[in-house]
Structure formats: structure tokens, C-alpha cells
A protein has these predicted regions:
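Two-component/phosphorelay signaling modules centered on CheY-like receiver
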Residues: 14-33
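Helix N-cap/capping motif at the beta->alpha junctions
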Residues: 34-43
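Non-catalytic signal-transmission and effector/linker regions of two-component phosphorelay proteins
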Residues: 1-6
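Receiver (REC) domain active-site loop signature in two-component systems and cognate sites
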Residues: 59
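Active-site residues of response regulator receiver
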Residues: 56
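Short acidic/histidine-rich motifs immediately flanking catalytic phosphotransfer sites
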Residues: 48-52
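Generic leucine side-chain signal with a strong bias for well-ordered alpha-helical environments
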Residues: 8, 23-27, 45
């Protein structure tokens, strides 16, 4: 698996985003970005460059 893949972590709870990013880093995935809601994530995804998304299913908005 490519450890340099670009991963977007989406969650409205900043602590959960940090936990997921730290777990990914422990697994060797350090090329990560964060979005705090679906709208921000959609904007980032439209710009391209992400290979994988880890997202919360239940967020406001």
C-alpha cells in the first residue's frame, strides 16, 4: 500500500480528527488533510489530489 497516498479526514469533532490522523501516522500515512464538515470536504475534494477519505457519517449540515 502506498504510504504517500493523500488522505482527507472529515469530522465535525476536532478531537476525533486528531485521533484518526495520529492513528494514520502510526501506520505510516503522514500525507493527510482535515475538513470540519461536509461542505469543506466537498470543496477540497473538487480541487482534487485525494486518494482516500475517512469520514464521519453523521455530521451537522
Amino acid at each position: 500500500m502506498n504510504k504517500n497516498m493523500r488522505i482527507l479526514v472529515v469530522d465535525d469533532f476536532s478531537t476525533m480528527r486528531r485521533i484518526v490522523k495520529n492513528l494514520l501516522a502510526d501506520l505510516g500515512f503522514t500525507n493527510t488533510a482535515e475538513a470540519e464538515d461536509g461542505g469543506a470536504a466537498f470543496t477540497m475534494l473538487k480541487q482534487g489530489g485525494f486518494d482516500f477519505v475517512v469520514t464521519d457519517w453523521n455530521m451537522p449540515g
